[in-house]
Swiss-Prot record:
EC main group: hydrolase
Keywords assigned: Cytoplasm, Endonuclease, Hydrolase, Metal-binding, Nuclease, Ribosome biogenesis, rRNA processing, Zinc
InterPro entries for this protein: MetalPrtase_cat_dom_sf_prd, YbeY, YbeY_CS
Enzyme Commission code: 3.1.-.-
Protein family (similarity comment): Belongs to the endoribonuclease YbeY family.
Protein name: Endoribonuclease YbeY
PROSITE patterns, A to Z: UPF0054
GO-annotated biological processes: rRNA processing
Gene: ybeY
NCBIfam families assigned: rRNA maturation RNase YbeY
An annotated Gene Ontology molecular function: metalloendopeptidase activity
Main location: cytoplasm
Alphabetized Pfam families for the sequence: YbeY
Any one Gene Ontology cellular component term annotated for this protein: cytoplasm
Length: 150
């Protein structure tokens, strides 16, 4: 009889911009993955600037402008983990949005991490209709779980 060893999720964080602490980003991502019932997954989160995310947005989405968050799904297995993918966040855009929405940069980065993870799971709010509804419901569910856990 074989048993599957349950592993913790692995979150890798790279910071080009450093206004939000790495340990907080790791914790938020780990809590989000847990709220979604995901196990043995690896997620990368990269905090960058408008210039770099604009280049990524232009290359991968053919949109020559900065955006708040991009998600790059992987789905491969490596070292006992399913590599969920990469979430890339522009701290510059996150700062502007936080000011516009009247909350902290940390709150906005937390929201964007969750938003990016929901995209990695295959949901797409840009399709509108029922797909957008499912996306928003899942995003709000995870954000409420994070609020209760923090």
């Amino acid at each position: 009889m074989s048993s599957t060893k349950r592993q913790k999720n692995r979150v890798l964080v790279k910071l080009k911009k450093r206004k939000v602490r790495k340990d907080k980003i790791e914790k938020w991502a780990e809590l989000a993955l847990s709220a979604l019932g995901l196990n043995n997954v690896e997620l990368s989160v990269y905090i960058t600037d408008d210039q770099e995310i604009r280049e990524l947005n232009k290359t991968y989405r053919k949109k020559d402008k900065p955006t708040d968050v991009l998600s790059f799904p992987m789905g491969e297995e490596f070292g006992g983990y399913k590599i969920l993918g990469d979430v890339v966040i522009s701290q510059d855009t996150a700062e502007r949005q936080a000011r516009e929405l009247g909350h902290s940069l940390e709150e906005e980065v937390k929201r964007l991490i969750v938003h990016g993870i929901v995209h990695l799971l295959g949901y797409d709010h840009e399709k509108g209709g029922e797909e957008e509804k499912k996306f928003r419901e899942l995003e709000n569910y995870v954000l409420s779980k994070l609020s209760k856990a923090l």
